[in-house]
Amino acid sequence: MQRAALPVVLSGAATLGGCSQGVLDPRGPIAAAERLLLINSTAIMLVVVIPVILATLAFAWWYRAANTRARRSPAEDYEGRIEFVVWSIPALIVILLSGVIWIGSHELDPRAPIPAKADPLRVDVVALDWKWLFIYPDQRVAAVNELVIPAGTPIQFRLTSATVMNSFFIPQLGSQVYTMGGMTTHLNLLADAPGEYPGFSAMFSGDGFSDMRFTAKSVPPGDFAAWVRQVRSTGSALDDAAYAALAKPSKAVPPATYRSVAPDFFERIIDQTVAGPGKARGAALHPPARHIGG
């Protein structure tokens, strides 16, 4: 019996162990609010699930073949009190859940700015095959598979894809948002304290999907300024030629930085007028950039 239960115990421990860097271990206000929403929704649903399980066990025990005290009434097909309980409680649960989800969904709108004393930092995100490109338009630097942000500072993300549809997710900081070619989605996050938080693609996007990961490094504001100065003094510029090489499909790409980038580079990627996977399609169609919600 103990040996049979061992795999179940080990799988449960492994599952709970993964929560140390997931949605149940938030490191920002958005992720904390989402965890509370998840816990509240689960608790409300357990109000129905637990009584149903207990009632099933109780009915199975009471109406067992050996219980001669159990009364069988095959002629009865309606009982008002039972009907009231069966329909009213689920209806109330649905209404309560709807209210909780409605309020939470609007409060956690990914486009909504996060109130904070510090001015927000803008970061443009581009999904490539199979890596993430982060452009800092105000600092005019860029990084691949490494997101460095100052702790306690709201981060305003603009996201797009230079290839297939993808999904951007940092579980410990907050919401998952889709990226699409020729479009822009928006996301606002904040890291409460310095730390390193794993991020990844949450949507299958091809052969190198499993390696499409990055590290979000939250550092003190002074360290962020020092990092920007270091990036500006090393590496190469992110121009059309460098981007064309970067945009080629590749797996397990190590972190890299670019010391300079044109201020309109992100817009050119959206419009598909820069060399890359969407260049031919953009040259043929020249679709205007569309901006949608996160």
Annotate each PLM feature.
Residues 5-9, 40, 82-86:
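Alpha-helical transmembrane segments of integral membrane proteins
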Residues 14, 56, 97-101:
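Structural signal for membrane-spanning alpha-helices in multi-pass inner-membrane proteins
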